[in-house]
Amino acid sequence: MSRRGKVYLNARGKVEAGRRYTLSEALALVTDTARAKFDETVEAAVRLGVNPAHADQMVRGSVVLPNGLGKTVRVLVFAKGEKEKEALDAGADYAGSDEFIEKIKSGWLEFDRVIATPDMMGNVGKLGKILGPRGLMPNPKVGTVTFDVATAVKEVKAGKVEFRVEKAGIVHSPVGKVSFGPDRLMENIQALIEMIIKLKPATSKGTYIKGIALSSTMGPGVRVDPLDLRNL
């Protein structure tokens, strides 16, 4: 067995099969079982009582995590004139219009998030087959299609994450780095859960948040007792 396999099995052995932990216990386990030589990302998987096949039960949104994500986010803004300047002044890594559309068509993808002013979406939409599958297409529902580019850039740089429920009814979202420690990760998770609850569809009946699991990049999943979220 490889060393990596042994490390993972040792970490998994610390997590009791079938047990649902309190959020604080789960975070302590996630940080304790992270053994990679890099600063692992911590991800939350939230299982919801919705049917994403129904348009009126789609859950999609964004939230600015209070402690950020612990990584540098490269932001591209599609804008012209004064809005282009506002974007750059706010900290955008790249801002412009047609020149960046052509670069992307040629294979350039050295950015992590994309923002666009509404008047640019006619041209940006032509990049749908490139940006869409990568989750990079700007969308007004998450605030990335806006004339207020300065605020949008600052929020993304500060740790804004976008999320949407998948076909299986699960929302996946990063919530920070292992190096944050349990307390800062807790604050980020609270912000995420509060936003997901705020976006509960009116047509969702029964239990809304059915389960939560936390894990680091290379670590085992740790299940959280949804009832513990009542204390958030």
Swiss-Prot record:
Chain's role: Binds directly to 23S rRNA. The L1 stalk is quite mobile in the ribosome, and is involved in E site tRNA release.
Matching HAMAP family: Ribosomal_uL1_B
GO molecular function, a single term: tRNA binding
Recorded family membership: Belongs to the universal ribosomal protein uL1 family.
Organism, scientific name: Syntrophus aciditrophicus (strain SB)
Assigned GO CC terms: cytosolic large ribosomal subunit
Self-association state and partner proteins as the record states: Part of the 50S ribosomal subunit.
Protein name: Large ribosomal subunit protein uL1
Matching NCBIfam families: rplA_bact
Gene3D superfamilies xref list: 3.30.190.20, 3.40.50.790
GO biological process, one term: translation
Gene: rplA
Taxonomic lineage of the native organism: Bacteria, Pseudomonadati, Thermodesulfobacteriota, Syntrophia, Syntrophales
